[in-house]
Amino acid sequence: MSQVKLNLIAAACDNMGIGVNGALPWRLKKEMAYFTTMTSKVSEPTKVNAVIMGRRTWDCIPDKYRPLQDRVNIVLTHNVDSVKENVPEGVMVFPGLDEAIKYIEGREDIESTWVIGGSSIYRAAMTHPNCGKIYLTEIQKSFDCDTFFPNIDKQQFHLVDEEQIPGEKQVEGNISYYFRVYKKL
């Protein structure tokens, strides 16, 4: 089996919503900084991380933030050729997770791989044999959403503590949330 471990990272509200109308339903600066740090941080300065996302997630990232800096951006889509024409040089486009993993295996400079959405990409990653952990920010409030994080099967994923992840409640404005880590058994 491939050595590439998939880490999923998402923020979801009480109803497991992760998006509405192509945007995040909340504005949480500290939570967004956590996402950036987690998906960018490397232990060796010669390495970078990869972020894997679906085409709709790519489209939802504001132009000024695309591609996500200091990370190898990988977009998954059924329309590889048309998407390749519309992304900046250096952004990789593949038809599926297995092709992306094969590409990552061929690069010695990639330290960690992060799956950043959307729903169908999360679902595929959670059931993939290379799935390692889910880093889920659990927002303690409901929002209207049209996009949802897949249900986490507690028989397959167990809540774990990680030293560098704060376990205490986080608060921004009138929204509280927890950083959680689920490890695939």
Curated annotation (Swiss-Prot):
Pathway: Cofactor biosynthesis; tetrahydrofolate biosynthesis; 5,6,7,8-tetrahydrofolate from 7,8-dihydrofolate: step 1/1
One Gene Ontology cellular component annotation held by this UniProt entry: mitochondrion
Pfam families: DHFR_1
Binding site for substrate: 31-36, 71
GO biological process, one term: tetrahydrofolate biosynthetic process
EC category: oxidoreductase
One Gene Ontology molecular-function label: dihydrofolate reductase activity
Reactions catalysed: (6S)-5,6,7,8-tetrahydrofolate + NADP(+) = 7,8-dihydrofolate + NADPH + H(+)
Keyword Secreted: no
Keywords: NADP, One-carbon metabolism, Oxidoreductase
CDD domains linked: DHFR
E.C. no: 1.5.1.3
InterPro entries referenced in this protein's UniProt entry, alphabetically: DHFR, DHFR-like_dom_sf, DHFR_CS, DHFR_dom
Gene3D superfamilies, A to Z: Dihydrofolate Reductase, subunit A
Origin superkingdom: Eukaryota
Chain ranges of the DHFR domain: 5-184
Primary role: Key enzyme in folate metabolism. Catalyzes an essential reaction for de novo glycine and purine synthesis, and for DNA precursor synthesis.
PANTHER family, per the entry: DIHYDROFOLATE REDUCTASE
Similarity comment text for this entry: Belongs to the dihydrofolate reductase family.
Name of the protein described by the UniProt record: Dihydrofolate reductase
Gene name of the encoded protein: DHFR
